[in-house]
Amino acid sequence: MIRFITIPDFADYQVTLKLMEDYVNKVISDHEPEIIYLVEHLEVYTAGTNYKQEELLNYGDIPVIYTGRGGKFTFHGPGQRVIYPILNLASPNRHKDLKLYIKMLEEWIINSLNYFGIKAYIIKDKVGIWVKVRKDEFAKIAAIGVRVRKWVTYHGVAINISTDLSKFSGIIPCGLENSLVTSLNQLGIHVEMSEFDKIIQTEFNKIFK
């Protein structure tokens, strides 16, 4: 059984990044067990390896961190559950297949949202998890950006629970101009973070056996 570790309070992004990277090194060199960090960050904009500077619009006094994960700009802050799985894809019960790993992440989050009555989708050529908000119009509810070192995964998924969605106006989220973002709260689903965490742990064990 993989251990889920909840980081208390609001976590500084750079401190958490170092925590992840240090543990990845331990998994690689010392064969430490797989773990998953559950985090709620202080406000921060992060840029993945495919970012374009013009996609950073008006960040005000919110810090901007340039990371090594895949993807473009996104926002992290209170009310958002960020999940950092540190999994060894080279282990006998996993697969050395990054596309399969991302597909499993998507299925995991879609199933977790479905528990709360939210029908979520993946959309071709648009990374992340989406929900239909109006006829033929979708909004992103979860962002995905991962990195792998020697087949050990880090970074992960950010799901908007009760996030201040106005903060996304400081960027072009994930490089998708005019795209909408949403949250469980905005969809009328009010859930405590601890309750959400229980469901994602249950659903994880169904997908990542």
Swiss-Prot record:
Where along this sequence does the record place binding of substrate? R69, G70, G71, K72, F73, T74, F75, H76, A143, I144, G145, G156, V157, A158
Q: Where is the BPL/LPL catalytic domain?
A: 30-209
Kindly state which keywords UniProt assigns to this record, in alphabetical order: Acyltransferase, Cytoplasm, Transferase
Catalytic activity field: octanoyl-[ACP] + L-lysyl-[protein] = N(6)-octanoyl-L-lysyl-[protein] + holo-[ACP] + H(+)
Q: Pfam families per the record?
A: LplA-B_cat
Main localisation, per the record? cytoplasm
GO terms assigned for molecular function? lipoyl(octanoyl) transferase activity
Q: Which residues form the active site?
A: C174
Q: Which GO terms describe its cellular component?
A: cytoplasm
Record-annotated membrane-spanning stretches: none
Pathway(s): Protein modification; protein lipoylation via endogenous pathway; protein N(6)-(lipoyl)lysine from octanoyl-[acyl-carrier-protein]: step 1/2
**Locations listed in the record:** Cytoplasm
Q: Which domain of life is it from?
A: Bacteria
One GO term (biological process)? protein modification process
Give the enzyme class. Answer: transferase
Which purpose does this protein serve, as stated in its record? Catalyzes the transfer of endogenously produced octanoic acid from octanoyl-acyl-carrier-protein onto the lipoyl domains of lipoate-dependent enzymes. Lipoyl-ACP can also act as a substrate although octanoyl-ACP is likely to be the physiological substrate.
Q: Which HAMAP family does its entry note?
A: LipB
Q: What PANTHER family is this protein classified in?
A: LIPOYLTRANSFERASE 2, MITOCHONDRIAL-RELATED, OCTANOYLTRANSFERASE
Q: Which family does it belong to?
A: Belongs to the LipB family.
Additional note from the record: In the reaction, the free carboxyl group of octanoic acid is attached via an amide linkage to the epsilon-amino group of a specific lysine residue of lipoyl domains of lipoate-dependent enzymes.
Record protein name field: Octanoyltransferase
Species the sequence originates in: Rickettsia africae (strain ESF-5)
